[in-house]
């Protein structure tokens, strides 16, 4: 339900308005009936502007907003500015991404430096796979229920619960002297990772203005890659320190404590407060998020959220959950959104990124590098830099475009790596990696270069786009839908973590990376035919696009139209008249 704004009174001449629209200049709209405090902004990206019949004394412009059930920037005086409060909420939530990345980064270094500290013996390949996969298993379990838990207990409480899981898991690992205690610690930490990996993007998407929702969600991915980079850096520094791996694990408690402390003083999202009937808190959060917005329109937004909340079927929590699951699978647009969300998360895992990161240390050793933790910084650093590139491009270039750039690039890099592995002659004997034949020394350099190329294309596309999953689903199935998608990611991670070393032994590194190249090629085809362009679209428009198909051409045309509208008119400033306020 959008706001109906009948007319905005202009003191600008008709010709000047026309020139402004054509030249993308701002047009000032003022009212003699209202105060400057109610000044707002509106962009043509989410509105159609129609010229109404002009009176003798003034021009009148009719603005017809596009309905959007969850777009704060449309409902709240069309204000696209980013407040310090929203920035604070985004960065605090994104600490979950940092902890996620740190967890995936430190285990690679820890497995190398553990030595005989567990059970007084060296870990076997099977034990390493179990320790690595335990976190993925824990994350898979909690991600299935995290979406529903977020609706029951709140996004904030779920994030704080994930902090407690991190603390328990880290303490068990730091104090571990047996393999099974280490594995249990990793499992419990995985519970926290699974909750945080789902709730943090959901939290950010619910407090972010639409025009920069993509960028703010990418901040979580940026912190994830930053966590990996920090973990590799710390691992390199502690590689030769006695019990350095315990210190490495213990350092994960620092961001956990920071996030938990900050969340104690910050609110939940407005949508959650509305779900619980606490309209006063919802109004308070919206006021702090959009400080230049009139109280009338904030109250209108709260009323709309109340209406949307009442539209969720079911009289109690179990019935609502069951009906939501049915609606997710039976409504065509929801089912297509689910296919896209789960498909992208599966692609992220089954194109070999985690596998390549795990093996990068051994690859670099074959060309003369001895500290595998240190050289892994090159790959994780590339991942971080190109995630930053995605941050600046995802809302401008578009989600679909960067995916169709990234996936073919990944396929090419994997093919080259497979060929290079074949000529380099690396094979596994079941216990350690052995260079059977070095072949041409240049093949090692080729592998290094294309591992970096792979990391760049991964970070640009499939490393970031799947976490935009919240925008695929309407409000009443978003929690369950994002749970499905995130669980798919962790199921894939579990499969890869528990089988990668076995694949290297059975089908050789060359065959393993050729397998990933084939999956990457199929993934490109999937995205080309099934993933529409969603950048700049209203949430209502996303559901319309997916109603009777994936409608790739229609989505591209609509996204192009939105960009043209923004190019024609940057913004319209206005002050609502009392007539408008009463009508709202």
Curated annotation (Swiss-Prot):
PROSITE patterns: MFS, SUGAR_TRANSPORT_1, SUGAR_TRANSPORT_2
Official protein name in the record: Myo-inositol transporter 1
CC per GO annotation: cell periphery; fungal-type vacuole; fungal-type vacuole membrane; membrane; plasma membrane
Reaction(s) the record says it catalyses: myo-inositol(out) + H(+)(out) = myo-inositol(in) + H(+)(in)
Compositional bias (Basic and acidic residues): 30-42
Localization terms from the record: Cell membrane
Superkingdom as given in the UniProt entry: Eukaryota
UniProt topological domain (Extracellular) ranges: 103-129, 185-186, 237-246, 371-376, 422-441, 508-510
Organism: Saccharomyces cerevisiae (strain ATCC 204508 / S288c) (Baker's yeast)
């Amino acid at each position: 339900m959008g706001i109906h704004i009948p007319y905005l009174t202009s003191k600008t001449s008709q010709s000047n308005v026309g020139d402004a629209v054509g030249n993308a200049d701002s047009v000032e709209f003022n009212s003699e009936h209202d105060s400057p405090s109610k000044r707002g902004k509106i962009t043509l990206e989410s509105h159609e502007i129609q010229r109404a019949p002009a009176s003798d004394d003034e021009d009148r412009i009719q603005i017809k907003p596009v309905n959007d059930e969850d777009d704060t920037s449309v409902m709240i005086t069309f204000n696209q500015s980013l407040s310090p409060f929203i920035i604070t909420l985004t960065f605090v939530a994104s600490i979950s991404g940092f902890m996620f990345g740190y967890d995936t980064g430190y285990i690679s270094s820890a497995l190398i430096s553990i030595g005989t500290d567990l059970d007084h013996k060296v870990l076997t390949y099977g034990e390493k796979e179990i320790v690595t996969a335990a976190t993925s298993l824990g994350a898979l379990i909690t991600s299935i229920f995290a979406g529903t838990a977020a609706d029951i207990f709140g996004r904030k409480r779920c994030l704080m619960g994930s902090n407690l899981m991190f603390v328990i898991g880290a303490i068990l690992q730091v104090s571990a002297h047996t393999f099974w205690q280490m594995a249990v610690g990793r499992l419990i930490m995985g519970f926290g990772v699974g909750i945080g990996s789902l709730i943090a993007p959901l939290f950010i998407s619910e407090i972010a203005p639409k025009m920069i929702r993509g960028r703010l969600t990418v901040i979580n991915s940026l912190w994830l890659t930053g966590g990996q980079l920090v973990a590799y850096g710390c691992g390199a520094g502690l590689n030769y320190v006695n019990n350095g791996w315990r210190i490495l694990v213990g350092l994960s408690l620092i961001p956990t404590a920071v996030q938990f402390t900050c969340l104690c003083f910050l609110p939940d999202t407005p949508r959650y407060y509305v779900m619980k009937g606490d309209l006063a808190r919802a109004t308070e959060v919206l006021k702090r998020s959009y400080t230049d917005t009139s109280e009338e329109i904030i109250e209108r937004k709260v009323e709309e959220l109340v209406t949307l909340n009442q539209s969720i079927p079911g009289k109690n929590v179990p019935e609502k959950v069951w009906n939501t699951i049915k609606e997710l699978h039976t409504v065509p647009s929801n089912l297509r959104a689910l296919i896209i969300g789960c498909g992208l998360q599966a692609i992220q895992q089954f194109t070999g990124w985690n596998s390549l990161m795990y093996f990068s240390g051994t690859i670099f050793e074959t060309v003369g590098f001895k500290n595998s933790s240190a050289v892994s910084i090159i790959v994780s650093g590339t991942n971080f830099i190109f995630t930053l590139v995605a941050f600046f491009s995802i809302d401008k270039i578009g989600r679909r475009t960067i995916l169709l750039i990234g996936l073919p690039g990944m396929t090419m890099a994997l093919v080259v790596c497979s060929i290079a592995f074949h000529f380099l002659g690396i094979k596994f004997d079941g216990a350690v990696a052995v260079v059977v034949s070095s072949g041409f020394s240049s093949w090692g350099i080729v592998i290094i270069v294309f591992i970096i190329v792979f990391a760049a294309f991964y970070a640009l596309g499939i490393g970031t786009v799947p976490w935009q999953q919240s925008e695929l689903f309407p409000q009443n199935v978003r929690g369950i839908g994002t749970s499905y998608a995130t669980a798919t990611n962790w199921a894939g991670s579990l499969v890869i973590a528990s089988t990668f070393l076995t694949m290297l032994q059975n089908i050789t590194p060359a065959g393993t990376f050729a397998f990933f190249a084939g999956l990457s090629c199929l993934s490109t085809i999937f995205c080309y035919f099934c993933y529409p362009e969603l950048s700049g679209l209203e949430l209502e428009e996303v559901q319309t696009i997916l109603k009777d198909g994936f409608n790739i051409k229609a989505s591209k045309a609509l996204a192009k139209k939105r960009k043209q509208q923004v190019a024609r008119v940057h913004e319209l400033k206005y002050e609502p008249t009392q007539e408008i306020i009463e009508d709202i």
